[in-house]
């Protein structure tokens, strides 16, 4: 699953042609969901070129059950919110949103990827889909 997530974020951060297939819905209100963790990837990290910045991971109620148990039920949604990191004196603050990556569990709809559909929204804009019709690959 980690490789699939990294692939989603890579596609979202490097794709310039935006698709329009709404297979995975935009997660309205995701910042009010469960906050799972945050991290900052800084220059010098091997993934900095593609994934540098502040990462926040959010999960809906069903996904939290998956984190606590052994499997994620259908309807689980996990969000990878990637923002630029801005140095502000001795602090790091959030800059512009780079992408909102979404993993949506639906075993019937996304059979070829273990039940997960993937989408990235460029700059967090619901109209800027970067995965589109490839949501299940």
Where are these regions (language model features)?
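Catalytic cores of secreted/periplasmic or lumenal enzymes
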Residues: 2, 18-21
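Cleavable N-terminal signal peptides
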Residues: 6-7, 17
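Sequence context surrounding c-type heme c attachment/ligation sites in exported
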Residues: 20-48, 69-137
């Amino acid at each position: 699953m980690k490789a699939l997530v990294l692939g989603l974020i890579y596609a979202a951060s490097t794709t310039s042609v935006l698709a329009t297939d709404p297979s995975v819905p935009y997660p309205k209100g995701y910042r009010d969901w469960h906050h799972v963790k945050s991290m900052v990837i800084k220059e010098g990290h091997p993934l900095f070129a593609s994934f540098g910045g502040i990462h926040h991971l959010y999960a809906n109620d069903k996904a939290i059950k998956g984190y606590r148990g052994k499997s994620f039920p259908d309807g689980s949604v996990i969000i990878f919110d990637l923002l630029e990191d801005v140095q502000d004196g001795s602090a790091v603050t959030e800059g512009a949103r780079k992408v909102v990556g979404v993993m949506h569990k639906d075993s019937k709809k996304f059979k070829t990827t273990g039940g997960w559909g993937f989408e990235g929204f460029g700059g967090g804009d619901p109209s800027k889909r970067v995965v589109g019709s490839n949501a299940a690959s």
